[in-house]
Every structure is written in structure tokens, then in C-alpha cells.
Curated annotation (Swiss-Prot):
Keyword Transferase: yes
Family as reported in the entry's similarity comment: Belongs to the class-II pyridoxal-phosphate-dependent aminotransferase family. Histidinol-phosphate aminotransferase subfamily.
UniProt cross-references to InterPro entries, sorted A to Z: Aminotransferase_I/II_large, HisP_aminotrans, HistidinolP_aminotransfase, NHTrfase_class1_PyrdxlP-BS, PyrdxlP-dep_Trfase, PyrdxlP-dep_Trfase_major, PyrdxlP-dep_Trfase_small
Pathway participation: Amino-acid biosynthesis; L-histidine biosynthesis; L-histidine from 5-phospho-alpha-D-ribose 1-diphosphate: step 7/9
UniProt catalytic activity: L-histidinol phosphate + 2-oxoglutarate = 3-(imidazol-4-yl)-2-oxopropyl phosphate + L-glutamate
EC number: 2.6.1.9
Keyword Transferase belongs to the record: yes
NCBIfam families noted in UniProt: hisC
Protein name as catalogued: Histidinol-phosphate aminotransferase 1
Cofactor: pyridoxal 5'-phosphate
Pfam name, any one: Aminotran_1_2
Subunit structure: Homodimer.
An annotated GO BP: L-histidine biosynthetic process
Amino acid sequence: MTFLQQANTGVQALSPYQAGKPIEELERELGISNIIKLASNENPFGFPESAKKAIQNQLDNLTRYPDSNGFSLKAAIAEKFNLQPEQITLGNGSNDLIELIAHTFATEGDEIIFSQYAFIVYPLITKAINAKAREIPAKNWGHDLEAFLAAINEKTKLIFIANPNNPTGNFLTEAEIDSFLAKVPPHIVVALDEAYTEFTAKEERVNSLALLKKYPNLVVSRSLSKAYGLAGLRIGFAVSNPEIAGLFNRVRQPFNVNSLALAAAEAVLNDDDFVEKAAENNRRELKRYEEFCQKYGLQYIPSKGNFITIDFQQPAAPVYDALLHEGVIVRPIAGYGMPNHLRISIGLPEENQRLFDALIKILNLK
């Protein structure tokens, strides 16, 4: 008997998560330098100075365990978003929170609903806990909420919605989400994943935290990896009613967020200038991508995130490989069932120009 046969049956069915290729790996493989990475939707402006100072002040305390409750950071989040600290759960990135939600509310035989082309961690965690995935066919690359409602049955425990969606960038309005939540049975938990919400225009942004007052079955997760620039520290938070947050505290690891992440997150949380700089660059440069695609006849999915997904109308793997040889890393998404597409993170203007120039060369665009 092999160890695979000994493993949890859900784990037996899994394939490892494929992250964006690291710059160092490409340097080793091809021996090239001056590489740009437009693969993982990271903040192109680097690590915020406010977070650097906070980390420096924590270095002498690293022999001590972090505050398991994250009291100070929770207080800062509560103040910024007009919440109660008891509503907040901290996570080692929002991925940690997605897993925490699934482990808390679903088990073998239960059903979890999510969309086709949604964040790949949803099906991964569903398999890992031996739950049944109800993957709803996408509508115009996004969530078909009416089909979600039709799929609900007595076994449904959890619904995942990403807004904006990754990797397609589709966006649901507040009215659409409100109407949907009003029709979901109140015992079914709805997890609204808002990792990219800071990149949507302020006038379009969903006031999801206000919806918590109407829908006690709603859990909203946020990431500090994207607009806030803390991807390497792994920090995110979820907001829910206090009863649900209390359940999360029964399941989460006792020290799931490290001291440096706690300090950096608290510092950058109110660094509005840094976040707005990233959002403004994204708005401007995303428009350049759209104009580039329109000029050269490339099809793309309109995006509200800090990325754009381009349809090359043929298998995209050769384009991806050719871009690597040009020193440009983007994200293949065949694992999402989109083999003809590449997802490209919005970078700095000069990085985006390198990507444009590389595509013109590779595709012989005229």
C-alpha cells in the first residue's frame, strides 16, 4: 500500500496549487536578468515605507510569540471600517480564511457552490475536506447568481463568490449581491471574497460590510496582499457576525499570523496615499491594456481587478513560453479551464510597455 492510498480521499484527488513563476526560478532556468513579473497580481510599487518602519520596530521582539488574538490590528480594522473587533478574524492571507470558512461549515457529503472560472482555491479546499463541488457554469465569464440559487438544495452548506472575480475580473454590483443574499436560505453561509475590491472605482464599490447588518450568514474576506503591498507577509481578514467569528476562532491555528505581518498590516491599513497610488496606476494602465488589445485585435475580458485576461484564440502556452524568454512572467490559466488565455497583472507603465513590445514581437502584430 502506498502513502497516496493512505491519504485522505479528498487529498488523493488533489493536484498541487500552481503559483506564478518566481523571478529567481526563471533566472536559474534561462540565465537571464532584468525580469519583470506580471503574474501574481502584486502591488507594483513595492513594499510600503510605513510597513518597513513598523517591521523594524518589531525585530527585537521576535523571540516572543505574536498576539494570538491580534488585538491591536483588530482594533485598527474596526476603527477604519466602523466594525466591532468581535466581528473580525485574522488570517495568514485570505487563502487561509477561505480554508477556515470551509473547514468550519462543510464536511464530507456537504455541497459547496462556486462558479466556473472562479478562484481555484475554492475547488481545492472543497476536495480536501471531501465535500461535493457544485461548479456553476459561468455567464459571460462571471457568476450566474440565478443558477447559483437554482443549485441550492438540502446539502448546500457554503457558497463562494469572488468580487471582482479572479482570474476573469468580472464584477457584481451591490444591487446584484443584495438581491442574491435576500434569496439565499439564512442557514447557508455566503463567503464574499473581496481580495481586489480596492481596485474598483469608489463609486462602484460594493458596501459589503453594511450588508453584514442585513445578512448574518454573510462572511466578507479581504486581502492585504494586493493594494496594500504585503503579499510576502501573508495577512488578510474576514468580517462576519460575532457568532461566526467565534466559530472561526475554534478552528484557526493559535498563532496563524506572525508578528511582522501584524505590525505591518496595522501600519499600512491607514496608508491611504500608498493604496490610492496603486489604484490610480491600475485605472490608468488597465485602460492602456484595453487600448492595446483593441488596436491589435486581441480579445480580452473587461476587468475590475488589477489584472487583465487576454484570449489568444489558440493554446496560449507557446505565447507564455515566448514571453519567458523575453524576461516577462505572466500567468497561464489552463488549470482554470482557460487554455487559450493568459492573465496579466497590471504593472508600472514601463513594465506594461515591455509586455506590449514583447507581444508585438512574438505575435508579429501589425
